């Protein structure tokens, strides 16, 4: 198991500058709670007593996923600081309690339980990998609590207890495959980390390729965080001797080794263009621009999105954390999540009654850095679709952008088992999965 950080509490208040004061109260780890909660008891949390409203932040601050998740925490804390500076929520300041999931899925479940049972938070912003989300999902459903999940994922899920502010497959994976088929070739080698997101994503990609005249020539996986990539690169060269598309769903530190050795093996983007769905500006910076220049990524947001709302977001982030920092899609989705929660709480006129907050969240809109987004009845966002190419400066040149926000489709329509299904939490009779045809 990866090393765990001690519990930390961040009480974030606004100050006279953009700058905020962050009062850090470091505490030793508490013993695991043995409190049990009935499936409906969390409908009223009682976590907003006094002058503060407690929320949880649960991401990997250590282990292989820290390369990606630390920056998401920064974005969530920035949103909280902005809200507190502007007067808070319902006249109260937000108190954020931060926990480290340590890139270990049982730890995520343990920390989610602690945040709900011991810290009595009103909601949690957290997770990155689908494995961590799947680990905490039973906790949120059994305790009838609320998670805001900020990362693109494989779909095939629609929980009452989760709001998904990252992309569904039809807002990232599917349009990127279409773009590759039109612009880069028909033969695909699929490489991913060995857990639920890459395997489910590749199931979708294979079904889409079959439906649209593409061909999957190879598929291989690495344990999450593994840097033993030589065998996979050899397989790619054998399966695509004359070049072809590499579709990459690796996560964490594996990407560092993969792209360095890919270049070392002579598999450059001119003949072997890769499309990644978990590499954004932060990862490009960590891996090195020289290794990623000319490769592609599909997201809803890039730092290079042109517009005043994004400029304000980027400028604020750099002012708070340093001019050398970059923004990326999961950070933007996490930032959106905090504001959508705030708006839902204000509409519901309570942070504690989670049923009212859930109902109030549906239909909320937000002028996000990517463009205006809407929280649909299926607990997913209507979002813009973009594809970017890594440039010399480590940022993405946008080569494709949708004209408008694309409605989310959680249940994939290329996969036979879920074709014709949808989700609608505004109607209890429909709920998380119902047949439309």
Give the residues covered by each predicted segment.
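Extracellular/periplasmic periplasmic-binding protein-like sensory domains
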Residues: 262-335, 346-352, 402-436
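Solvent-exposed, acidic/polar segments of extracytosolic/periplasmic ligand-binding ectodomains
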Residues: 362, 368-437
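N-terminal export signals
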Residues: 8-28
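Periplasmic-binding protein-like
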Residues: 115, 119-127, 148-150, 189-192, ...
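Extracytoplasmic "Venus flytrap"
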Residues: 56-75, 99-106, 128, 194-199, ...
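Bacterial lipoprotein signal-peptidase II cleavage site
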Residues: 27-37
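Beta-alpha junction/loop-to-helix N-cap segments that form part of ligand/metal-binding clefts
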Residues: 67-72, 86-156, 165, 222-226
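Extracellular/periplasmic Venus flytrap/periplasmic-binding protein
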Residues: 110, 154-155, 160-265, 304-312
């Amino acid at each position: 198991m990866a090393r765990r950080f001690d519990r930390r509490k961040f009480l974030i208040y606004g100050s006279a500058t953009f700058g905020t004061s962050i009062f850090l109260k470091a505490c030793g780890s508490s013993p695991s709670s043995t409190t049990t909660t009935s499936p409906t008891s969390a409908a009223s949390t009682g976590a907003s007593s006094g002058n503060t409203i407690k929320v949880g932040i649960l991401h990997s601050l250590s282990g292989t996923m820290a390369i990606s998740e630390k920056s998401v925490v920064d974005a969530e804390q920035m949103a909280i600081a902005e809200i507190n500076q502007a007067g808070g929520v319902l006249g109260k300041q937000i108190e954020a309690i931060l926990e480290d999931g340590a890139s270990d899925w049982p730890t995520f479940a343990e920390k989610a339980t602690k945040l709900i049972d011991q810290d009595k938070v009103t909601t949690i912003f957290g997770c990155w990998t689908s494995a961590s989300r799947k680990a905490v999902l039973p906790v949120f459903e059994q305790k009838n609590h609320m998670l805001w999940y900020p990362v693109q994922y494989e779909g095939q899920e629609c929980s009452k207890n989760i709001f998904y502010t990252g992309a569904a497959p039809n807002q990232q994976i599917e349009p990127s495959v279409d773009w590759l088929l039109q612009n880069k070739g028909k033969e695909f080698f699929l490489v991913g980390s060995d857990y639920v997101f890459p395997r489910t994503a590749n199931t979708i990609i294979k079904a889409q390729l079959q439906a649209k005249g593409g061909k999957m020539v190879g598929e291989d996986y690495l344990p999450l965080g593994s840097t033993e990539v030589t065998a996979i690169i050899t397989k790619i060269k054998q399966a695509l001797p004359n070049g072809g598309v590499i579709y990459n769903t690796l996560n964490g530190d594996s990407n560092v080794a993969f792209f360095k050795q890919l270049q070392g093996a002579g598999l450059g983007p001119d003949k072997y263009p890769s499309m990644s769905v978990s590499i954004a500006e932060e990862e490009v910076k960590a891996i090195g621009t020289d290794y990623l220049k000319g490769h592609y990524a599909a997201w809803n947001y890039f730092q290079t999105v042109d517009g005043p709302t994004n400029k304000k977001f980027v400028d604020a982030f750099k002012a708070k954390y340093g001019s050398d920092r970059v923004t990326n899609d999961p950070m933007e989705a996490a930032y959106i999540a905090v504001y959508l929660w705030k708006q839902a709480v204000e509409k519901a006129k309570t942070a504690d009654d989670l049923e009212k907050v859930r109902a109030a969240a549906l239909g909320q809109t937000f002028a996000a850095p990517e463009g205006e987004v809407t929280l649909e009845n299926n607990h997913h966002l209507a979002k813009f679709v973009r594809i970017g190419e890594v440039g010399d400066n480590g940022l993405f040149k946008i080569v494709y952008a949708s004209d408008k926000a694309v409605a989310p489709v959680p249940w994939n329509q290329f996969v036979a088992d879920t074709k014709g299904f949808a989700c609608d939490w505004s109607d209890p009779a429909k709920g998380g999965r119902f047949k439309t045809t």
